[in-house]
Amino acid sequence: MNALKLSVKTLIVLSSLVFSSLALAAPLTVSGVVKSQNPLPANLRIGVFFTDRSGNPSKELSSSSVTNNSYTLSLAETAPPTNGLQALVQDLLDWPGLIGKINITGTAHIARTTIRAYLDTNNDKGFSSGDTLFESFVTKGRGSIVIVYSDAKTRVKADRGFDATLEPGWNLLQIELGNPIKVARVNSVEGVQVEVLGTLGYISSHLLGF
């Protein structure tokens, strides 16, 4: 009887671990509204772009159309190419709320991203040469979000209680500014506002690859 109870408990624990793994492996989703001082054009899209070391967009990862000023982004589980990864060092981190002394535990290579609005000029449902890219200000309540890929588990800590753990694969971090600064790793987040600002001066062809 005791052996049976032990087996049942073991099965429950294993099942919980499996479901937890599946939940974390689910595609990440970000949804919210688009804000602009001007009327939004019908062919406006919201995209997630990989960034180079300087923080400039380098290649589109995912995008969403804008309907009634709303969008929903879904990020695939596909890993970025090796040449899109950069060693995780302090100088590479420009996350909201990351201030003061930064402490990184573990060694990892990451791929950073940025969210931008753009005009899909040829209506091909993706960013291509000739499309107009806009500077965009992304907020979530009193903070913002970070979308980052890591090839290993690592931890980033800083002043005011900033504490973020990156797991292998894609990470969606929701950051709430304050004292302390709260960081949560989540699978989805709603209510993310993308404010469309001025046009960027990049050459569009630069954004088509690493």
Feature locations, PLM:
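Short, ordered, surface-exposed loop/turn motifs in non-cytosolic proteins
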Residues: 37-54
